[in-house]
Amino acid sequence: KAEIGMYYQQDVIQAVANQGTKIKSIGAIVQSPLSIVLSLKDKNITSPSDLVGKTVGYGGTALSESIVKTMMEYVGADASDVNLIDVGFDLMSSMTTGNVDATIGCLVNHEVPQLEEEGFDVNYFMANGYGIPNYYEEVFLANNEMIESEPEVLKGFLRASAKGFEDFKKDPDGCLAILMNNQNEENFPLTQSVEEKSCETLLPLMETEDAPFLTQTEECWQENIDWMLESGLIDQKVEVSDVMVDLGE
């Protein structure tokens, strides 16, 4: 139904390993995580050690549970030291109303500027500094059949995406104007100042000195496969070649 999709790196690994889905990543959109552990500033939570005895809201996923477990063990604590509560999609409101002390799963480029816009002071930290391997927040993917039969079409898409990213770097305000002019205002209204901050946060994470936009490495995929297998998130080990492909220039 679609030639190209956007998905999360760990979800790609799970889909291939646990369900046998015939897909592969063809390029990384963001070179590092955007998902964070977020809290209001007065909670004084700046690392996993500060989560001991605290209540943390999450979206009910096994991935978030494994991340918390790994982080807590990394700092010498235990997952049972944290009270995890499934709050569904109410990550922000559960925190601002005081129902939880922190949340895991909010995005640094969305919920942080949104909360700051609403007048809240916040603290946050990334999980990948605490036993979690670095990962790509989102990737472009295609099904294996198309990768085999129409690689030139996919290469053309990646070239166009890279051109769009270059335009974004050169004229972020102009690109933001396109976003604002095409927003779904009725169902998902956007705030100009929030989206400006979001772009400022996102832009430097989409490429690094060593990794241009769309770069993905076998090492990053292998580290995530190994961690997910160790954490019980996947039923069997998969090869890097099962989940990613380098289409070349």
Report residues per predicted region.
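Predominant activation on well-ordered alpha-helical scaffold segments within soluble catalytic domains
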Residues: 13, 69, 113, 222-225
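Secondary-structure end/capping motifs
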Residues: 148-233
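Short, hydrophobic secondary-structure boundary micro-motifs
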Residues: 24, 176-178, 236-238
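Short helix-capping segments at alpha-helix termini
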Residues: 74-79, 118-120, 186-187, 233
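Pocket-lining segment of extracytoplasmic ligand-binding domains
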Residues: 10, 90-93, 98-187
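Short, glycine-/small- and polar/acidic-enriched structural segments
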Residues: 1-88, 92-97, 101-109, 125, ...
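Hinge/cleft segment of the Venus flytrap/periplasmic-binding protein
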Residues: 224-249
